[in-house]
Amino acid sequence: MPTYENIRLAIDDRVARITLCRQPLNILNIAMMKEINGALTTLSREILVAIVFDADKECRAFSAGVAVEDHAPEMVYQMLDSFHAIFRSLEQLAKPTIAVVDGPALGGGCELVSACDIVISSERGKFGQPEVKLGVFPPVAALLLPSIIGDKRARELILTGEIIDAVEAGRLRLCNHVVPVAQLEQKLMEVLSKVRELSGSALEFSRRALDLGRHQTLDEALKEVENIYLLELMKSYDATEGVKAFMEKRKPVWRNR
């Protein structure tokens, strides 16, 4: 089994567990993205009934999002390629995925949660896509959130950068289960006990069939949204200004172009 710096990978009884452990907030930089995708490549050779994503107990967030510095013009192509590779791998693997959230899941962290089939959150969970405040937008969330929480609410979250708590996330069906912190692992074990009784191949076929509900594959949709992000958005003044202002710890001065 490969070793990693920013994640841990464990396999037990046909369940893989990818634990994010880049303290304190599991900020997703390019190196961490590549480790996650490397772990998924390793798992493609395993017989599994589920892949679990969670965070190390020493971390204060599931993930507070993608590193802002990786949105800089000289890094953004590599960042987007590395980040979206995770979602392409998840679609190709077609294994049931479970996110276990205790604390904030924001930006890219919320997108990873949105891509999972089952989401279990503690009452401390926070969810949102604040990218618009940096002058950019969340490509994966733009594709996935409308079908999960409804078009109008997805538009509101993405266009305002609103952060919601776990109770609201549960009401919107972004989370399947919201439980007290002390019951988080117990709820995960309850879900895993159900899938461990099932055929891995039946689960994979079911996952692939569910994905057919989209009018196009995630890979095809990502290619289109990447064109908007890289060829249009990242050439705008405001995208550069938003990232620069964040790094300089000041309010952005928008020019609306």
What feature does the model see in each segment?
Residues A72-S82:
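A short acidic, glycine-rich active-site loop
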